[in-house]
Each structure stands twice: as C-alpha cells, then as structure tokens.
C-alpha cells in the first residue's frame, strides 16, 4: 500500500488534480495505526476520498501546497497536545521531539491547532476547517491551561474552526465527508455524535435534558465564585 501524498509530485502520481481533504498535522507523517493522522486518512481513503497530508507546515507555501481541497481541511496538533510536546511540568522547553524527524524540537508551533486553523482561515476563508485529535478533544470546553495559569476558552472558539471532532474521529469522519460531498453546508452538520459546533447566542435553542455549563466569562474569573463554577462545569 503506497503512502498518501505529502507533495504535489506524489499527488500527480496518484493521478489526482485536487484532493478532497487536506490533513494538516503537527507530527511527521508516519503511516502507522498508532498515529491518528494515518488512521483518519486511511479511513477516508477506504471510503473513496482523495486525501493529501501536510505535516508540520511552516510557511504559507506549505499550507498552499495542494491548493484548495474539494471538501475541507482537517487539522490536528499530532499525537499529543502541542504544549505537552514542547514543555516539561516545570515549564522548561523540551530539547527533543519524538514525533519529528531526527527528534528535533521546534517543528510545530505552540497551540498548534489554533495556529494552523487561523492560518488556513486566513488563506482560504471559504473552505471548511474541521479540527480533531487529542489537543482539540481535551480543549473542547473552557479549560484550565497550566502554562498560562488561567482558564482559556474552547479551542473551537479560539481557532475559528467550523467543526470540532472529539474522541475516536474514525467513528464520524466518514459521515461528515459523505454529507459534505452531498452538498451540505458545514454549518448544517449539527446532529453528528462526537462533534462540537459554535452558534450565536441569539440562535441558541436549549436541548431538552442537556446539562448547561456556566459561560466562559463566569468560569474564567479567578475568584472563589469563578473557581467553584469552573469545578462544577
């Protein structure tokens, strides 16, 4: 089984002119099931979709390597949270990176999901961006960030992504792909289990039986009340 394309030359060898999806990841491309990018890309390939991969982009040209995907960009930080990959518990910069060629550090940015998504939204504002992986999953709600020592908003809000997938993404990525391919707008994908999406407050409709957490503006206040609300949420 050949590797999936990470260069235009390799895409041409597949006979493709345009990919359906471009995966942007903070790790090197390793086609092994211990890597989320490998699993998601092969699941999509098995479902009949053309997938190209941009590992550890640095310049605008890296993001633009394959041009606009037909359906969406898919973004993850890699196998682990980018801040955990970069810093020790003592907040010291790590000197190596197990998920980068040669073990060298510095090939992905801090808070990679936010950085990658904002760049893609700047370059291709009309193309949907779906985020997933461990960093997106564990930061999908307002969360305490050890390195900033404060509560940060959901990574979905900070990044500006259209859709967040959490947990085992292979369980819902094909449904997302099929519905986008059928012509549905990304904003209409509001009924897929294992996903999060943002709505304007004016458009919010309470869901019967759902637990509603306190707003970020309340849980992020560093006083006793805010901390209690955060713990409850």
Where are these regions (language model features)?
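Short N-terminal or domain-adjacent regulatory/targeting segments
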Residues: 1-15
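Long, low-complexity, serine/threonine- and charged-residue-rich intrinsically disordered N-terminal tails
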Residues: 9-12, 23-27
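Histidine-anchored nucleotide/phosphate-binding helix
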Residues: 12, 38-43, 117-120
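Active-site-adjacent bridging/hinge elements
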Residues: 15-18, 151
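Nucleic acid-processing catalytic cores of prokaryotic defense/repair systems
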Residues: 19-25, 32-70
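Loop/helix-junction capping segments adjacent to catalytic residues or to phosphate/diphosphate-binding pockets
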Residues: 30-31, 174
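Glycine-rich beta-alpha loop elements in corrinoid/cobalamin-binding modules
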Residues: 36, 55-233
């Amino acid at each position: 089984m050949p590797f999936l394309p990470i260069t235009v030359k390799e895409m041409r060898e597949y006979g493709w002119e345009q990919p359906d999806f471009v995966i942007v990841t903070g790790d090197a491309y390793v086609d092994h099931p211990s890597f989320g990018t490998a699993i998601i890309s092969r699941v999509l390939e098995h479902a009949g979709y053309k997938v190209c991969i941009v590992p550890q982009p640095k310049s605008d040209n890296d993001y633009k390597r394959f041009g606009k995907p037909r359906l969406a960009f898919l973004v993850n930080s890699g196998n682990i949270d980018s801040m955990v990959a970069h810093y020790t518990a003592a907040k010291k910069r790590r000197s190596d990176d197990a998920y980068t060629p040669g073990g060298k550090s510095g090939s992905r940015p801090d808070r990679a999901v936010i950085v990658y998504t904002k760049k893609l939204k700047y370059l291709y504002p009309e193309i949907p961006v779906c985020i997933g992986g461990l960093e997106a999953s564990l930061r999908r709600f307002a969360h305490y960030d050890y390195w900033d020592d404060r509560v940060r908003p959901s990574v979905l809000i900070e990044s500006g992504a259209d859709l967040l997938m959490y947990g085992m993404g292979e369980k819902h990525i094909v449904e997302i792909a099929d519905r986008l391919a059928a012509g549905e707008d990304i904003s209409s994908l509001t009924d897929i289990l294992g996903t999060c999406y943002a709505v304007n407050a004016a458009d919010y409709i309470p869901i019967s039986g759902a637990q509603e957490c306190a707003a970020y503006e309340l849980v992020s206040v560093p006083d006793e009340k805010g901390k209690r609300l955060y713990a409850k949420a």
